[in-house]
Curated annotation (Swiss-Prot):
The lineage of its organism: Bacteria, Pseudomonadati, Pseudomonadota, Gammaproteobacteria, Alteromonadales. This is Pyrimidine-specific ribonucleoside hydrolase RihA. GO terms for cellular component: cytosol. Keywords: Glycosidase, Hydrolase. InterPro entries: I/U_nuclsd_hydro_CS, Inosine/uridine_hydrolase_dom, IUNH, Pyrim_hydro_RihA, Ribo_hydro-like. Pfam families: IU_nuc_hydro. Belongs to the IUNH family. RihA subfamily.
C-alpha cells in the first residue's frame, strides 16, 4: 500500500536523514517538502531542503518555504546543535532547482486538494506551518489521514527541563494541532532518545559504497559532537526525526499507547510542555498515539538497508 506524504521539516541533520530515509521507499509518495524555521533560520532550512533533494536527484518534488517565525513569539534556533549552515559536516551540492513561488501552506493545501487519496503530514520541526494549514483550510481536514510528528515528551524536555525543542519554539501552534481532531502519532523524546546511533552503526553506514551513505555518515559525525556532552548521558546520538518515517515504514518496531496530550502555553516554568495522560487521570479522550518504546537494532537495520537503495541506478534514473 502506498501512502501519500508531505514532509514539513527544518533541516537539520536528523531532518535530512529522515528525508533520505523516506525517499528510499517507493511506498511513500512525497507530494511536497515544506520548510519551517527551527534548527536554523528559515532561509537556511529552505536552502538545506533543496540541497538534500539535489543530492538525491529529486528536483521533481515541489518545495516551498513556510512561516519565518512562530505564531506569536520570536524565533529560537538550535544552531548549537546543527552548526552554522544547519547541515554542517558533509560537502553538499548547491541547489539545482528553485522553490515554488508560493508559501508552504499554499503548497500543502494544493497537494492535499489534488491528491487521489488521503495525505499524511510528517512535520519534524516546529508546528507553525501545520497549524496555519489547519486553521486556514478546515475543508481539507477530512483529506488528512494522520499527522506523524516529531515533538514533545511524556518525560523530561531537552530545551527546558519540561519542554522538547520543537514544541517549545511554537507552543501555540502545537496546541492547535493537538486540538484539531486529526489522528496524531507523537514521536517524542521518550522514544527518540532510544533511537541512538552508535559509532559502530556509523561505520556500517560508511561502508556502504554510495555517495548518499557517505553523506549520512558525515552528517552523523558532526551530529555526534553535540551529543557527546556527558550531561546528556548518551552513548550515541539520538536520531529524533527519522523515527517518524520509521514508524510509517515499520510500526512493529515501536511500542505505542493512545493518550490525551495537552500543550502548556502559559506557564513560566513549563511553557511548551506536552502533558501526556498516560494513566488516564484526566478522563479526557485520547488525541494521540504516543510512542514509548523502540527496537533500536531494528531501527538501525532499517536505516542501513534503506541507504543501500541509493545505488547509481537510483541516482541516475531521472
Amino acid at each position: 500500500m502506498t501512502r501519500h506524504i508531505i514532509l514539513d521539516c527544518d533541516p537539520g541533520h536528523d531532518d535530512a536523514i529522515a528525508l533520505i530515509l523516506a525517499l528510499a521507499h517507493p511506498n511513500l509518495v512525497p507530494l511536497a517538502v515544506t520548510t519551517s524555521a527551527g534548527n536554523q533560520t528559515p532561509d537556511k532550512t529552505l536552502n538545506n531542503a533543496l540541497r538534500i533533494l539535489t543530492l538525491l536527484n529529486r528536483g521533481d518534488i515541489p518545495v516551498a518555504g513556510g512561516a519565518t517565525k512562530p505564531l506569536t513569539r520570536e524565533l529560537i534556533i538550535a544552531d548549537n546543535v546543527h552548526g552554522e549552515t544547519g547541515l554542517d559536516g558533509p560537502a553538499l551540492p548547491e541547489p539545482s532547482f528553485s522553490p515554488q513561488a508560493i508559501t508552504a501552506v499554499e503548497l500543502m493545501a494544493q497537494q492535499i486538494r489534488q491528491s487521489t487519496q488521503p495525505v499524511t503530514l510528517v512535520p519534524t520541526g516546529p508546528l507553525t506551518n501545520i497549524a496555519l494549514l489547519l486553521a486556514s483550510h478546515s475543508e481539507l481536514h477530512p483529506k488528512i489521514e494522520r499527522i506523524v510528528l516529531m515533538g514533545g515528551a511524556a518525560g523530561v524536555g531537552n530545551w527546558t527541563p519540561a519542554a522538547e525543542f520543537n514544541i517549545f519554539v511554537d507552543p501555540e501552534a502545537a496546541d492547535i494541532v493537538f486540538k484539531s481532531g486529526i489522528p496524531i502519532t507523537m514521536c517524542g523524546l521518550d522514544v527518540t532518545h532510544q533511537a541512538q546511533i552508535m559509532d559502530e552503526d556509523i561505520e556500517r553506514i560508511r561502508a556502504i559504497p554510495n555517495p548518499i551513505a557517505q553523506c549520512v555518515a558525515e552528517l552523523l559525525d558532526f551530529f555526534m559532537i553535540y551529543h557527546r556532552d556527558p550531561k546528556w548521558g548518551f552513548i550515541g546520538a539520538p536520531l529524533h526525526d527519522p523515527c517518524t518515517i520509521a514508524w510509517l515504514l515499520k510500526p512493529e518496531l515501536f511500542e505505542a499507547q493512545d493518550c490525551w496530550v495537552g500543550i502548556e502555553t502559559q506557564s513560566e516554568l513549563t511553557l511548551g510542555m506536552t502533558v501526556v495522560d498516560r494513566y488516564q487521570l484526566t478522563g479526557k479522550t485520547a488525541n494521540a498515539t504516543v510512542l514509548f518504546g523502540l527496537d533500536r537494532l531494528g531501527f538501525v537495520d532499517l536505516l542501513v538497508d534503506s541507504l543501500r537503495v541509493y545505488d547509481p541506478t537510483y541516482l541516475n534514473r531521472r
